[in-house]
Regions:
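Alpha-helical transmembrane segments of multi-pass small-molecule/ion transporters
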Residues: 1-313
Length: 313
C-alpha cells in the first residue's frame, strides 16, 4: 500500500511542484504579472503548438487515435456540460449561470491534464493527450461561447465569430496541420524537429509556473459558497461519474487513466478570460480556478491511487 502511494506521488508531484513553484516565485517577486502575461502568450502561441504538433507527428496514429476513447470523451463532455448547466439553473442567480457552467465543465486539459498524462504514460500519454486536446479546444470554446452568450449581451455568439475563434487558435492549427502529415509520414529535416523539441520541452514547466503565478490567494479568501459548490461539481462529482462510466464501458489501462485525468482536471484559466470578455462575474471565475487547482492536488492523487489499487490502470 505504501509503495503504491509513493508511486502515485511520483506521478503527480512533479506537476504540482512546478505549479506551486509559480506561486512561490510570484510571492518572492521573482516573477510578476507582466512575466505571466508574456510567458503565457509564448506558451499559447509557440510552445504548446510545437508540443501538440510533435506529439501527433511522432505518434503511431493507429494506436494513438482511439475512436472509442474519443467518442466516450465527447459524450462525457456533453453530459458534463448539460449537468453543469442544469446545476447552474438550480443553484445560482441567472447572471452567474454562464460562469458557473463554464467553471464546472471546462478543464485545464491542455496543460495540467496533458502534463499528468505525460508523467503517467510518457510519449503515448502525449500522443493520445494531444489528439484529445485538439478535440477539447473545439468543444470547450464552442460550448463556453454558447452558454456565456445566453447570459451576457456583450459576447458575440454568432456561428461566424465562434468558428473564427476556433480555427484561428494556434493549438487547433497545430493539430490540423500535424494530423495529415503524420498519416502521410511527411519527412521533416532533423534540424527543424530538434528546434521544435526545444520549444516543446519548455511548454509544460513554463505553463505550470505561469498558472501558479496567476493563482490569487485573495480570490480564494473572497470565494463564497457558490465557488465551492462549482468546484465540488468539477473536481468530485463529474470525475466520479465520468470515470465510473468509462470503467463500466470497459476502458482499462492507459485509456481509463487518461480519461480520468482529463475529466478530473481543474478549471481552465481561459475561463477567466472568457468571463471578462463577457462582462461576467470574473471574481467568481477566478475563485473557481484557484479552488479547483488546489483541490486537484488531492483528488488526482486519490483517483490515481484507487485506480492503481484496483488494477484498472
Amino acid at each position: 500500500m505504501l509503495a503504491l502511494l509513493i508511486q502515485t506521488l511520483n506521478i503527480t508531484a512533479p506537476v504540482f511542484a512546478m505549479l506551486f513553484m509559480g506561486v512561490l516565485l510570484k510571492r518572492i517577486h521573482l516573477i510578476d504579472d507582466n512575466f505571466n502575461r508574456v510567458a503565457s502568450q509564448l506558451v499559447f502561441n509557440v510552445c504548446m503548438p510545437a508540443l501538440l504538433f510533435l506529439g501527433i507527428y511522432h505518434a503511431d496514429l493507429a494506436s494513438a487515435v482511439k475512436p472509442g476513447v474519443i467518442l466516450y470523451f465527447v459524450v462525457a463532455t456533453l453530459v458534463g456540460f448539460a449537468v453543469a448547466w442544469g446545476m447552474a439553473i438550480w443553484r445560482c442567480p441567472r447572471a452567474d449561470r454562464g460562469i458557473y457552467t463554464q467553471g464546472a465543465f471546462r478543464g485545464n486539459n491542455g496543460v495540467i491534464g496533458l502534463a499528468l498524462a505525460a508523467s503517467l504514460y510518457g510519449d503515448y500519454g502525449i500522443s493520445l493527450g494531444a489528439v484529445l486536446a485538439g478535440l477539447v479546444i473545439l468543444m470547450y470554446n464552442s460550448l463556453s461561447a454558447v452558454v456565456l452568450a445566453v447570459y451576457s449581451p456583450d459576447l458575440k455568439s454568432d456561428p461566424w465569430s465562434i468558428c473564427k475563434s476556433i480555427f484561428s487558435n494556434p493549438l487547433i492549427i497545430s493539430v490540423l496541420v500535424a494530423t495529415p502529415m503524420a498519416y502521410g509520414q511527411v519527412p521533416l529535416p532533423n534540424w527543424l524537429l530538434t528546434s521544435g523539441d526545444y520549444l516543446a520541452q519548455m511548454t509544460l514547466p513554463l505553463a505550470l509556473i505561469c498558472i501558479g503565478g496567476t493563482l490569487s490567494l485573495a480570490a480564494l479568501r473572497d470565494s463564497g459558497k457558490l465557488a465551492i459548490d462549482v468546484s465540488l461539481v468539477k473536481m468530485v462529482w463529474l470525475p466520479l461519474i465520468g470515470t465510473l462510466g468509462a470503467w463500466l464501458c470497459g476502458f482499462r489501462g492507459a485509456e481509463l487513466g487518461i480519461l480520468f485525468l482529463y475529466i478530473g482536471s481543474p478549471t481552465a484559466a481561459a475561463s477567466y478570460v472568457m468571463a471578462r470578455a463577457a462582462n461576467g462575474n470574473h471574481e467568481l471565475a477566478a475563485s473557481i480556478i484557484v479552488i479547483t487547482t488546489l483541490m486537484a492536488a488531492i483528488t488526482t492523487n486519490i483517483g490515481i491511487f484507487i485506480l492503481q489499487w484496483g488494477g484498472w490502470i
